[in-house]
Amino acid sequence: MLQPINVSMESLNLITLAPMLVAIAGGLIILILDLINKNLHKSLYVMLTILILVIDFGATLGLNVNERGFFDVMLIDGVSIVSQLLIIVASILFTPLALTSKRFHEYSYPEFFALFLFMVAGFQFMVASDNLILIFVGLETASLSLYTLIALHNRSNSYEAAVKYFTMGALAAAFFAMGSAVIYALTGSIELYRVADVLAARMGETGLMIAIFGSSVLLLVAFAFKLSLFPFHTWAPDVYEGASAPLAGYMSVVPKVAAFVVSIRIFGMYIDLGVEWVRVVILVLAVLTMTLANLMALVQEDVKRMLAYSSISHAGFIIAALALDTTEGTTAIFFYYGLFMFTNLGAFAMLWMSRHKNRRFNARFDHPYEKFAGFIKIMPMGAVIMAIFMLSLAGVPPFSIFWGKIYVMQAAVNSGYVWLAIVMGLNSAIAAYYYLKLVVYMFLKDPVKDVDTVYYNLSKPLMAVVGFAAVATIAAIFYVQPLVSYIYYMISASGY
């Protein structure tokens, strides 16, 4: 006879679900409002989305470190809290970019904002669990929403970008599912902390090591797709080019933060178990990714594609910190992205500000270098701000990403990987060329005579976001130490 199962509300610890429930409820509220009144202005949806994200931020801050909830599938540790805060802050920065002076129809759809909030919830589920099924559900929820958001830009290359991203995402999901199935077959569990205990007790068995090799390869391929690591990066430039500029900037930060968290949990477990070849493969992928992406960025004719390859290179830079498997290395991942999101979102937002009619500068690209020729004479403050973002991405002191690069290289040296720090330094020098190339165009080239080919998509909310990102980039020297201290405390409290 079946026995009744008694589950107390206290044991469920539903507070661990609060941030995700806020985002999901917010998306449903937006859809209900649209059903009630079809004529609401997009500014209402923007403000409502920001309000929901602020509440989500508060709910995340209120979580206690190292708690489990909802049948133990939710894991609230320092890694999950820090990554959720990064995801929410980047989402808050992105949302006002919908309030442009020119009309872009995707932002007039309430479905856009509802899908956006569902996507945020999906990423939060990914980072707040060590249960492989819930990670997969969060991954697919976020990915399916993101594919749709790309396609809503409603241009032929946007549809192409959405299909490419969907295809690559489906492949990554298949590899993740197969890798997870191998882990379950080996251990009888889908919770990573239990998986680690079972594998530790059986290390040394020949058959087990072969199976671990198989699962590791499958999962490495899955996350190489998601993080756009070499040689699984080829989709990224085309997808970034087809997406709207703000969404491309968002994609360069938030999905990667979520993927890094899951990678830390899975590959950190393998490295801790002594599967040293996983560390070696990650280091090789890191070096190849940052180097080849930088070389490809050198020959790009379009600023947006250059920034796409730049984002790939930065992902390669950061994946090296994961291979270190130290508290300092893990801290470096979140510290770097905490600085990177302001600069990169700001740079993509600057592309959103200036557009050229009928592609007169270039038949293929929306943002060719020629469009920015003499930008200092046409839009002086815009040129200065864009130069700040480029100098920061190049790692020039005292701008924000300089401190991130220094911290990552310091973590590598402290772990005994001096050669890795040297490779990082050389790649930063290569990258400086293509960032400074745009600065040269803006400050030293003459503007195109027919200035009417360019129009400016300016609005006060957009200028506020770009201004805030610029201030955060310049003033990093004043908050890097508190930020590092907070992240280090949260990471060490989680045992990483």
Swiss-Prot record:
Membrane-topology annotation of the record: Multi-pass membrane protein
Keyword annotations: Cell inner membrane, Cell membrane, Membrane, NAD, Quinone, Translocase, Transmembrane, Transmembrane helix, Transport, Ubiquinone
EC number: 7.1.1.-
GO biological process terms on file: ATP synthesis coupled electron transport
Matches recorded under Pfam families: Proton_antipo_M
Alphabetical list of InterPro entries matching this protein: NADH-Q_OxRdtase_suN/2 (IPR010096), ND/Mrp_TM (IPR001750)
GO cellular component, one term: plasma membrane
Residue ranges of the TM segments: 12-32, 43-63, 79-99, 108-128, 132-152, 166-186, 207-227, 257-277, 280-300, 306-326, 333-353, 383-403, 416-436, 464-484
Known catalytic reactions: a quinone + NADH + 5 H(+)(in) = a quinol + NAD(+) + 4 H(+)(out)
Main function: NDH-1 shuttles electrons from NADH, via FMN and iron-sulfur (Fe-S) centers, to quinones in the respiratory chain. The immediate electron acceptor for the enzyme in this species is believed to be ubiquinone. Couples the redox reaction to proton translocation (for every two electrons transferred, four hydrogen ions are translocated across the cytoplasmic membrane), and thus conserves the redox energy in a proton gradient.
Subunit field text: NDH-1 is composed of 14 different subunits. Subunits NuoA, H, J, K, L, M, N constitute the membrane sector of the complex.
NCBIfam families in alphabetical order: NDH_I_N (TIGR01770), PRK05777.2-2 (NF004444)
PANTHER family: NADH DEHYDROGENASE (PTHR22773)
Protein name from the UniProt record: NADH-quinone oxidoreductase subunit N
Organism field: Sulfurovum sp. (strain NBC37-1)
